[in-house]
Amino acid sequence: MADLKDFAEQLVNLTVKEVNELADILKEEYGIEPAAAAVAVAGGGAAGGEEAEEQTEFDVILTAPGGSKLAVVKLVKELTGLGLKDAKALVDEAPKPVKEGVAKDEAEALKAQLEEAGAEVELK
């Protein structure tokens, strides 16, 4: 198992030149067309980074109501349009999403408002 981990680490750390050499060896000596595999290995890390940077929708998660629970319940009621009973239940059952799939600017504004009211909030 340790050998496979070492191999995987070496494979991930290959330079572009080394990946191309590996592709040539696989094609010439073993008849394997590694084009798709080479793209996956070379582009795998970059794709994950780009995806994180391009996130456009966020979930606003209430992790804890904080010290001023009443103010947080009122604000959640106002922000979500829920009734008082439902807003209180949402706050009591934290961590819970307050809003899901909102734009970054709106998510940050909601987070700021909730934190101002004393709540602990995170964006996902």
Swiss-Prot record:
GO molecular function, one term: structural constituent of ribosome
Superkingdom of the organism of origin: Bacteria
Biological process according to GO: translation
Keywords on record: Ribonucleoprotein, Ribosomal protein
Keyword Ribosomal protein applies: yes
Gene3D superfamilies listed in its UniProt record: 3.30.1390.10, Single helix bin
Keyword Transcription regulation attached: no
GO terms under cellular component: cytosolic large ribosomal subunit
InterPro entries the UniProt entry points to: Ribosomal_bL12, Ribosomal_bL12_C, Ribosomal_bL12_C/ClpS-like, Ribosomal_bL12_oligo, Ribosomal_bL12_oligo_N_sf
Pfam families (alphabetical): Ribosomal_L12 (PF00542), Ribosomal_L12_N (PF16320)
Assembly: Homodimer. Part of the ribosomal stalk of the 50S ribosomal subunit. Forms a multimeric L10(L12)X complex, where L10 forms an elongated spine to which 2 to 4 L12 dimers bind in a sequential fashion. Binds GTP-bound translation factors.
Similarity annotation: Belongs to the bacterial ribosomal protein bL12 family.
Function: Forms part of the ribosomal stalk which helps the ribosome interact with GTP-bound translation factors. Is thus essential for accurate translation.
Name this protein carries in UniProt: Large ribosomal subunit protein bL12
Species: Christiangramia forsetii (strain DSM 17595 / CGMCC 1.15422 / KT0803)
Origin organism lineage: Bacteria, Pseudomonadati, Bacteroidota, Flavobacteriia, Flavobacteriales
